[in-house]
Amino acid sequence: MRVPDHPVALALLSAFGGGVAAPSANRFGSVSPTTANHVRAELGDDVDFVLDGGPCQVGVESTIVDATGDALSILRPGGVTREDLEAVLGRPLPVHSTSRVRVPGQHPSHYAPRARVVLVAPEKVVAEAERAHELGHRVGVLLPPSVTDTPVKAHAVVALPGSMAAYARGLYGFLRELDERGCDLIIASLPVEEGLGLAIANRLRRAAGPRPAPTPFDAPAVAPADPS
């Protein structure tokens, strides 16, 4: 059970007067929407209308904690950080690390744009992007703050904000933007995995994860490319 912390969603629940069962507002495995326009672009005529409450205030999804056993653990890091929870609990809270899928977002490939995502060290982002560009890829770059002043040859560049809160809020929009601009490859790096950085790194790893083989009815919009 989830209860949103947003005046528009709370008003909807109040007006309806009951519980609401609904799927996520995006295709399974693809980049999560954080604006009403993202929902409309992805679902199109499959939905009758979109209730627009403005851009998501947090961006990354909720934190999911396993409380079914004797010891608590984080199944999916999210907007409520591990440090927030540990401050309340008064003890360390581990992140669930087994391969068993128990909750949304634990699949090896999830939150994935059409373009292939490749993760490299922050100091290698520019060099790897330019190498892929020379090989003929339409390269999109999530440029970390440490190198935002460095020119980079690429098809499209998003200069990331220095604030982890702003990064978490904008992550999915950045990935969608690079898709919309026709990139077939996205070069990115992981942030420091503390605070919201833990959730951001989790989403980027899933976005870069191995894609399931498509069925004849589910061919990829952009064929995976080899950055080497």
Label each residue range with its predicted role.
Residues 1-228:
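Active-site-adjacent structural elements in enzyme catalytic cores
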